[in-house]
A protein has these predicted regions:
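N-terminal leader/linker segments that initiate helical-solenoid repeat arrays
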Residues: 9-52, 285-298, 302-305
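Alpha-helical segment of the N-proximal tetratricopeptide repeat
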Residues: 16-35, 56, 60-63, 116-128, ...
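Structural marker of alpha-solenoid helical repeat scaffolds
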Residues: 43-46, 80, 109, 143, ...
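Helix-start (N-cap) detector for alpha-helical repeat units in TPR-like alpha-solenoids
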Residues: 51, 85-86, 114-115, 148-149, ...
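Structural signature of tandem alpha-helical TPR/SEL1-like repeats
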Residues: 63-72, 95-105, 127-139, 162-177, ...
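Terminal, low-structured helical/coil segments at or just beyond the last alpha-helical repeat
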Residues: 105, 258, 262-305
């Protein structure tokens, strides 16, 4: 067995090498230090030293646009240090730069692709430029009318721009087009139901809500919609069953708990209704956390309850 003094000496030397490598990597000498960083990253040992080596190695590989190799390191870092701010920062940088590089190559190599129009539409959508987004989605559909998700995204952009009668009908038609391509799209079914409800066509809407629940039995919003229909028909026990499923699917969904509370009351289950009221109060109460505790230490009031 190696004497303890020798082990400590090796550790100190290893740490010195690491500090030197980190300094060189930070100065931009990635080509000169990456092989040694990779060896340190692959060597079992002190976890924090491996973390530092991994962070530097990932950043060097990102800078060199070696995204598959960087992704491997980032993935292991996230697994071993899931709450580490430095790891999460490097992960964000990796995904952003990999995305930007892929987008650049797509615009360069396939400028006429419908995917370019789709991506442009998505960018406009995030900027709140819905007129431009709608135009780009329509270009994409003109090039590939059978592209999955294009009609859905166009419908969503139409609704984001306006809820007037014309926009609602156009959106309904686009959701319907999506369903013709992908009949298993529960969200599109639900959206059609929502529009038909707004258009005062409850019977047609109900069929779409029912279908959405069939497609996705844990779809909380669709379960709530069907439960409201059951409650409207005074079929309260059936509404309760549906809403209990919605609450199970989304335990912190206030709308699910509220509708379940009302259904319990209508079904004569006062104690269960009170339990749901307590749960709603819990959801609405701001969580106690670091910021609240910080305010308390300063003598300031916590957020209003």
């Amino acid at each position: 067995m190696m004497p303890v003094t020798n082990v400590l000496l090796l550790f100190v030397l290893w740490q010195g090498d690491l500090n030197s490598l980190l300094t060189r990597a930070a100065a931009g000498d990635c080509s000169g230090v990456s092989p040694q960083l990779a060896r340190m990253w692959a060597t079992p040992g002190d976890s924090q030293s491996r973390r530092l080596a991994g962070l530097a190695l990932a950043q060097c590989r990102i800078a060199a646009k070696q995204f598959p190799e960087a992704g491997s390191v980032v993935g292991e870092l996230e697994r071993d240090f899931p709450a580490d701010a430095d790891v999460l920062y490097v992960s964000a940088a990796y995904h952003l730069k990999a995305w930007n590089d892929a987008v650049y190559r797509m615009y360069k190599n396939a400028p006429a692709s419908y995917r370019v129009d789709q991506l442009s539409a998505e960018v406009f959508e995030t900027q709140g430029k819905y007129t431009e987004a709608i135009a780009e989605y329509r270009k994409a559909i003109a090039k590939n009318s059978k592209g999955i998700d294009l009609h859905y995204r166009l419908a969503r952009a139409l609704l984001a721009q306006s809820h007037d009668a014309s926009a609602l009908e156009q959106a309904r038609q686009e959701f319907a087009a999506e369903l013709r391509l992908n009949p298993a799209d529960a969200v599109a079914e639900y959206q059609v139901g929502q529009i038909l409800t707004t258009q005062l066509k409850p019977a047609e809407a109900a069929a779409h809500f029912e279908r959405a629940v069939q497609l996705r039995p844990d779809f909380a919003e669709a379960l709530i919609a069907v439960a409201k229909i059951r409650s409207g028909a005074k079929r309260y026990p059936e509404a309760v069953v549906l809403l209990e499923r919605a609450v199970k699917a989304q335990p912190n969904a206030e709308a699910a708990h509220y509708n379940l509370m009302v259904a319990y009351r209508n079904a004569g289950r006062a104690e269960d209704a009170q339990r749901e009221k307590t749960e709603i109060d819990r959801i609405q109460k701001p969580p106690e956390g670091e910021f609240t505790n910080f305010l308390k230490r300063l003598g300031g009031p916590p957020p209003p309850k």
